[in-house]
Amino acid sequence: QRQMCIRDSYNSLGYSKENGNVPGVSMTRFNLTSKTSYQINKILKIGVSIFANRRKNQNFVSDKYGYSNPVFYSRTANPYFYPYDAEHNYQYDYDILPGDEPDLKRGFNIFEERENTDNETIISSFNSIFDTELRFNDQWKLSSQVGIQWDQSSQEQYVGENTFNMRNIREDSSYDENQYIVPKGGMHTVNNATTSQITWKVQGEYKNTFNDIHDIQIMAGSEIRKNWYNTQFTAGYGYDPKTLTTKPLNIRNDKDAEKYKLHTKTYQENAFASFYTTGSYSFMSRYTIGGSVRMDGSDLFGVDKKYRYLPIYSISGMWRASNEPFIQRYKWIDNLAIRLSYGLQGNIDKTTSPFLVGSYDNVGLLPGYDKEQTIQIEGAPNSKLRWEKTASYNLGLDFSVLNQAINLSVDYYYRKGTDLIGKKLLPLENGFETMTINWASMENKGVEINLQTRNITTKKFSWYTTFNFAYNQNKVLKINTPDSQETPSLEGYPVGAIFTLKTDGIDSETGRIRVKAKNGKSMFLEDLYKVAIDEWGIGIYTPQVSTLEEREFYSYIGTSDAPYTGGFMNTFNYKSWELNLNFSYNFGAYVKTTPSYSLTKFDASRNTNRDILDRWTPENKNGKFPAILTACLLYTSPSPRDMRRS
């Protein structure tokens, strides 16, 4: 009689703590892994795997401008500002926000900010897998697997009363004279998100060899998956961390209530089902053909039944030429194979829906009346919504020689995506400006090369090299361009296309940027856009060109995605030591850089790039960079506030 025994077992427990570059920033991690398989009898094996993880991140709460980030603040702060006085009391920078005068109600001190805010995030996850395997013989095998997954993210934030962040929030809520929506005190928020999922998978496999020359492998199975996702957010104002109490908001109307939400909750549930089969046949280990068919279904496409399931499939073939007699006589050739495949893949865009989707809300329809429950429509329904599809064509070559000393792999691919989700303009009588439908299209094609070499191998020393090269070209074949879009359509261009106005240097008399029109004529921006004269001198201009005309101003210069990418890796081993030298490269991409200073909103009280020293001024008409301008496009000197701070 055969008794159940433990066949394999693996258990690990880990704990780690990392401190950030800034005091007060840290992360602790705890993880547990346990995998055990049991041999019940000759043909039955079961397994249990448990994965648990808990991560705690400690940080500070960042204000909406990002000033509490030391890296950002160090690049923008006034370099002459002292954060403490002689008695080590906080001093405040009242010029941290742009404006003509200091804001005495919104002083900023980065050390006070980091002392009186707290941001704690706890991420917990638990994943268990229960699998069963029935191996009847060397040819037949049946397996089943059940997976249960649970993930939770809990974030708790505290912003103290004595912080720039809280002062700024409260001042933004002011109205009339010294009246505020947000009460005095701090702010406490809790944001929780939970994801649960259960998966059941069953699969059967058959493989056999006939007459030592025919190899057959067949696999079929199904997978059913359901997941649940919910979030909950709560906020309290006027918070006192000692008494753990909050104060009510001074809500005047529905607009205030919408801006300062105290509680929100969302819930989402989805189900998926997949059925698949794959098979391959090989003759004399030289000629191999394979294929697969898969049916994926989702309740995201529940209106039209014919769109619920997407049949995806692939076919492939391979000729292992190195097993041919006329090549086997060349002993230095280890492997030579040519691969060819075609496949259709599907994708789900969960931001869209075939149903009329809305969110509940409580709105006061008329002044003086109680609020009524309403539904805010989020978009037009599309009963024909279906899967996005991608067709792929692949051709590959594998080549290795000299006892695997040199291994080369070359692949060419072409992929075309159809029925991609995109927005389509609708006649206004439909009640919606746009509808999300399956109609966009794009293509990708390219080459990938991988070369691995074994350069030196001895008893104590070895040197291996890996070289990767990839070229990719993509193009948008069909996309909707809204009438309000000011830049050219992406249709016919790469996804990362960059369109720019061609410049023609800096005007020597005014320091302003000149642009070059399509006819080659050099002019100012207001001439190009036919801007109406600002009669009142308050910086309000009205362009006299349509968006269609404006698109013609732009020229395509390139893409932000590098067409050529790759890497070069070297691995050196000496006894028990290993050294890795890795390099990567990207060619052919254009990078958009942010101007090193603002032409119209420059603040001399803030730290800035040295480029500004080489700007155009009446005394430096050969400056490399444009002049500082007012909203009326006139040269300006520093403001009284700037002169006071300098």
Model-derived features: where do they sit?
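Low-complexity intrinsically disordered tracts that form flexible linkers/tails across taxa
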Residues: 57-75, 479-483
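Transmembrane beta-barrel wall of Gram-negative outer-membrane proteins
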Residues: 1-3, 7-60, 70, 125-129
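Glycine-rich, aromatic-lined ligand/substrate-binding cores of catalytic
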Residues: 560-591
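Residues embedded in well-ordered regular secondary structure
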Residues: 1-3, 7-23, 61-64, 89, ...
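Acidic, glycine-rich flexible loop segments
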Residues: 1, 66-111
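Extracytoplasmic gating/loop element in the C-terminal half of outer-membrane beta-barrel translocons
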Residues: 111, 165-167, 173-174, 586-637, ...
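Conserved small-residue
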Residues: 233-240, 437, 454-560, 600, ...
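Extracellular/periplasmic, surface-exposed regions of secreted and cell-surface proteins
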Residues: 29, 35-44, 49-54, 102-159, ...
